[in-house]
Amino acid sequence: MKVLKFGGTSVGSVNSILSVKKIVEAIEEPVIVVVSALGGITDKLLATSTMASKGDLAYEKELSEIIARHLDVIEGVIEDKEVRIDVQKKVMALLDELSNIFKGVYLINDLSAKTSDTIVSYGERLSSLIVSNVIKDAKLFDSRKYIKTVKQFNKHIVDFDLTNKLIKETFSPLPKVSLVPGFISSSTETGEVTNLGRGGSDYTASILATALDANTLEIRSEEHTSEL
């Protein structure tokens, strides 16, 4: 079994996502695919959050661009009309949630750490939903259900005992292709959305590879591939 992590540049465009599809579908052994948000989306989510918290209505334009980016990608990577319509509906449901959160931030002119964590989680939730419908036989798993964190010194630290246990339970039996959003996690105590910080998708991949004793862990981007 191998774990492959694809960064934002590797899932940043129609062509790059189709390249991911080709790479993964050529692998014969079971594989876990970890994806980041579409290239540039995490930064855009953070910037839009800041604008909304300052009462800058221009955040709506940024949000519109985020929505258009994801819908354009869906149009380019999913040929089957029925599947495409289904994915569009699911993606729009997530984007509607995101829009409501931004509206709340704008109205109260405040952005808490908890709300910020929730907002940035949508990047990976959206990308993983899209990519899971591009790769043949891929099964989507929600990282919030098995990567758990506890708060120490005002930071989210992985609760490895619980996380390793949940990972082994979740991925048994192991599907041919498991699609996993990187970066995101949830609190052991409250269940609220947390994240693993910058570079968190690499961390997600290494956590999974270690817990499941993977033969190979590959960190891929358009620029290079590193095998660990």
What is the predicted function of each stretch?
Residues M1-S226:
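Nucleotide/pyrophosphate-binding catalytic subdomain
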